[in-house]
Structure formats: structure tokens, C-alpha cells
């Protein structure tokens, strides 16, 4: 039915939406309303996808302001995001390809409404706590689904953490911010991140935290190059060695 977005049911109220392997969004369905976490690239109508799964009133929350997490907002009336990522989102929304695509399809980005650390979303029977995690971007957030003990992390915690971007925080700041939220390891058992195909153990956050600390201590000595569309930076392995923190030298 849909060419790009493939839906995977994780339990009776959580759905993973895989946008052609490029980004992942989620739908959490409560008793009174449903929450869309990240709307992905916007090439395909994610609203229509969601409406095949629930007819409840919808709320959209973006974990951060990057294009592969917000461009699908064009199919909704409003979305919530941490205002600290407003400039990031503004820059991405100015991408020529996106501007031209919206014009051709008569689509518009809806306004962002603010959401902040310690806010609580009540879906009816399911509650999510907003947890600030500046790092990958200045306004990144996580969402803790308390009843299922699941932490949605966007790109702030994953197996290939991008810290080489202009908007990314210094690595010492990321370490400090990770230390502030380590309490979640006692409140969640699993992680669902912004490019996942399934769940990760909550231990990923500890592995990442220790990896950042090791990177700072070693100053990246011996780290290999990391080639990406923005140039060549560095990558520091963590955890089982298959995960990496991608960073630029000026973030050390």
C-alpha cells in the first residue's frame, strides 16, 4: 500500500515506521489519543500511514530539528519540538529541494509548538516524560514511556552518533548531559532510536556514555577517518566496537 514506509508492530500499542531504511518514526496509541514521534523524510504521507493504524486524535513530537525527522510534519496541522532546535529546523526547512517539493505539492510546514524538559504527555493509560538531551543537536529530547519502560531517543542515543555537525555540542557537554540522565537506566529497559529496526537494551546509553568519556580521555588517538557527505571527520568505537561516535576534532 505504501512504497517507502513499512510498519512493524512492536506490541499492542507501539508501531515502528521505517522510512525506506533512512529514518524511523513511531506511533504510540493510548486510550484517548495517539502520539507520533518523528515524521521522517516527508516523501510519503505519514499521516495516511498512521490513519491505517488508529483513528484517535493525534499529537506529533519531533525529537530534534533535522530534516529526516521533521519533513513529514507537512502532513499534520502542528508539531511539538524543543525551541532550542528552532534554528536547526529553520536551516533544514530552507533546503532548496524541500522548498520546491512543498511548492509543487502545495504542502506547508505547520507551526512548531514548544515542548521542554520535564513535560508530561498523557495519552490515556500511557504517559511519556520529556527528557532533554543536548548533544547531537542543542534541543534534542528523549521520551520515556513509563508503562512500557521504553526510552525513545531520536538521534541523541544510537549506534552511530553524529557529533561532527556544526550544531552539535562539545563532547564534554554531551558527557555532562548524559550523566544527568543516567537515572533512566533504572526506569527503562529498552531504547528505540531514530534509525532503529527494533529495540536496543537500555545498556546502550551506558556504553555510549563510557565511549564519550574514553574519547575525551584519549583525545581520539588512533581513531579512523569517517567519510560522510559533509567531508571527512573521525569515528571512535564504543560498546561492542561496532558502534561509533562520529566527531570533528574541534568538538574535543
Please provide the spans of the model-predicted regions.
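Metallo-beta-lactamase
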Residues: 2-5, 9-12, 78-132, 137, ...
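Accessory terminal helices/loops
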Residues: 179-252
